[in-house]
Curated annotation (Swiss-Prot):
Its EC number is 3.1.-.-. Involved in the degradation and recycling of damaged RNA. It is itself a target for degradation by the ATP-dependent protease Lon. Pfam families: SymE_toxin (PF08845). Residues 29-74 form the SpoVT-AbrB domain. Its main location: cytoplasm. This is Endoribonuclease SymE. GO terms for cellular component: cytoplasm. The keyword Coiled coil does not apply. It comes from Shigella flexneri. Belongs to the SymE family. InterPro entries: SpoVT-AbrB_dom, Toxin_SymE-like, TypeI_TA_SymE. GO terms for biological process: RNA metabolic process. HAMAP family: Endoribonucl_SymE. One of its GO terms (molecular function) is DNA binding.
Amino acid sequence: MTDTHSIAQPLEAEVSPANNRQLTVSYASRYPDYSRIPAITLKGQWLEAAGFATGTAVDVKVMEGCIVLTAQPAAAEESELMQSLRKVCKLSARKQRQVQEFIGVITGKQKVA
């Protein structure tokens, strides 16, 4: 029995029926013995609309009777400047000072010797 001060919330489905898909587990043949292994194939424009564009990394969680697919966000590409900075960090201390002096000269904060 519920508490006298509680209000029952209507239960709404997390996914609308229009977004439900029905699939059947089929099989794929495995070489060299051609044994049949279970297979599920997903394809359709709805995948991209759901955030699964071609090339998207997908995290797969498997539980008894349940498979959860989660699209992984694309890693932000590092800017060309940051890539160059990483290269400079691998140089010797003398070459790093030369790069710093060069930056000082082109920004006008340091005089040419």
